[in-house]
């Protein structure tokens, strides 16, 4: 996932990339001569601090949160800041310098336009009816409007268009164990003799194989580990004018010297360290997992770290058993998190950062 904020950074990137995909599907991309982005409500009011405008440009250039190469994206933004270059759907290769659309390796690339963050229209006092995080993207051919879409970033990186119903990932339209509340979840699990994780796995297997579910979960876990490792190796100051010093790396070195065996006495210190490390990596613009949001993305890795290192029966298990524990952990967490998303909110704009 992209750094900083799930609703203000990940969502806008997804929305603008989705807009480009719709242009490609409609065979309109090569006709675009100009593009414009309007930001509304909270996206406009706090967009500068969350990297909203930059994220929208990156999405227009073909970057997506799941696979974004931070170095490539920043190189593109650096060039944009110098000459305004905006390659719709990205560059076919490093050597590509033309302005004409084309394709390479089966991927479609659009025209290279000129458009900067400063040209976006910010409307912080205008809140669209559906959600406070609204954005409109318009593509022009000369003065003619080719396409215009309004998107809403509803929290957790999820994006909807207009009156579209909110969904995330593959839709579990006919799961064997549908539930809409905690009480229903517990009752279904008890009646079926299943744990919450087992019930959730059965539901997930209605749209993908168990092997695919496991691979996806373990892939997410690997990204979390890489995020933590990257943060613990950083030194210096966090980005921004306040000159906040990085703390996770130094704290990790001190804690390793004081508690090399990870004794129970220091469990809370390790949990807090992992959460801080993820948050600092997010502030640096590194890759984090939006679970449930970027602002709260340190909690799941921190709790999982505790589970893997301090839970009896897991700490000294073999690799296969530890992977099973990770899968169960994520399935149970997803079941509970889905209820928060459905029955309340995971959007900081709606429930605040503590709500996340």
Each PLM stretch: what is its role?
Residues 7-24, 301-315:
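Alpha-helical support elements that line or immediately flank enzyme active sites
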Residues 11-15, 52, 296-300, 356:
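Catalytic-loop motifs flanking and including active-site residues across diverse enzymes
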Residues 28-30, 127-131, 280-282:
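Solvent-exposed alpha-helices and their adjacent loops that cap or buttress functional pockets
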Residues 30-69, 76-83, 321-356:
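A structural-propensity feature for long, helix-poor, extended segments
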Residues 59, 64-259:
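C-terminal regulatory domains involved in ligand/effector binding and gene-expression control
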Residues 207-349:
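Accessory "access/gating" subregions that flank catalytic or transport cores
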